[in-house]
């Protein structure tokens, strides 16, 4: 988990440091939103992620909101999720609503200079064979977040699925989800 935390911190800092360098006179807090399923749920940002971003931006200039839930598909965050075929689920977006409640509480009466969304999720969608709609779901989720925050400049860091099932034996769409994650950030 320490290597994962280090990698996420480096990626998030890379995005936001470039923002900071572009506008040295900008004011406001740097908001980091961490969400996804089990690997993100197990992440303890207070141990390394939060101290690293506070060291970079100053402790008074950082807001970190983490809300994650293990074993969940992206449809629990993306409200307009649609399967490639078949019946649509009854509930979508409930975990997103929970996340946004936390974000709104943390940013109330705060000026936000930058937003970085750190997302670690995909195993459940690989298992449920939703690879065909995963990239569109990521794009929709980021658009949903941008709309709700009233921003077009959200940085996004994706914790890509590992290479453990490159033969798609346990999770039929493992490599499809990995490619969708890669294509999304390209």
Language model feature labels by segment:
Residues 21-186:
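Cell-envelope and extracellular/periplasmic
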Residues 1-4:
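Positively charged n-region of N-terminal signal peptides that target proteins for export
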Residues 6-16:
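Bacterial N-terminal signal peptides
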């Amino acid at each position: 988990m320490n290597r994962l935390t280090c990698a996420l911190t480096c990626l998030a800092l890379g995005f936001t440091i470039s923002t900071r360098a572009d506008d040295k006179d900008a004011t406001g807090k740097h908001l980091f939103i961490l969400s996804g399923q089990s690997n993100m749920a197990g992440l303890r940002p207070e141990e390394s992620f939060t101290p690293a971003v506070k060291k970079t931006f100053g402790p008074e200039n950082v807001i970190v909101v983490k809300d994650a839930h293990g074993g969940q598909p992206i449809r629990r965050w993306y409200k307009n999720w649609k399967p490639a075929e078949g019946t649509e689920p009854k509930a979508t977006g409930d975990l997103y609503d929970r996340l946004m409640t936390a974000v709104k509480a943390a940013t109330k009466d705060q000026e936000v200079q930058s937003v970085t969304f750190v997302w670690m999720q995909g195993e459940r969608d690989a298992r449920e064979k939703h690879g065909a709609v995963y990239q569109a779901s990521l794009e929709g989720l980021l658009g949903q977040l941008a709309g709700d925050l009233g921003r077009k400049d959200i940085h996004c860091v994706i914790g890509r699925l590992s290479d453990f099932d490159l033969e798609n034996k346990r999770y039929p769409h493992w490599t499809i989800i990995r490619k969708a994650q890669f294509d999304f950030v390209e």
